[in-house]
Each structure stands twice: as C-alpha cells, then as structure tokens.
C-alpha cells in the first residue's frame, strides 16, 4: 500500500493525490 506516497510526504495535497491514484476510494 506504500508504493506511491513515499516522495509526496512533503505536501498534504500530494498525499491525497497519490492515495487517489494508488487506491481509488469513493471519497
């Protein structure tokens, strides 16, 4: 599950972006 947001841990927007890309959850 941690194979995308390892380099985007510096911004909040980036984290939610990668999470949506790696795990398409119905938010």
UniProtKB/Swiss-Prot annotation:
Subcellular location field:
Cytoplasm
Keyword annotations: Activator, ATP-binding, Cytoplasm, DNA-binding, Nitrogen fixation, Nucleotide-binding, Phosphoprotein, Repressor, Transcription, Transcription regulation, Two-component regulatory system
The protein's PTM annotation reads: Phosphorylated and dephosphorylated by NtrB.
Q: Which GO terms describe its biological process?
A: nitrogen fixation; phosphorelay signal transduction system
Q: Name one GO molecular function term.
A: ATP binding
| Entry keyword Methyltransferase | no
**Listed GO CC annotations:** cytoplasm
Specify the domain of life of the species encoding this protein.
Bacteria
- Specify whether Signal is a keyword of the entry: no
Outline what the protein does: Member of the two-component regulatory system NtrB/NtrC, which controls expression of the nitrogen-regulated (ntr) genes in response to nitrogen limitation. Phosphorylated NtrC binds directly to DNA and stimulates the formation of open promoter-sigma54-RNA polymerase complexes.
User: What is the name of this protein?
Assistant: DNA-binding transcriptional regulator NtrC
Its gene is: ntrC
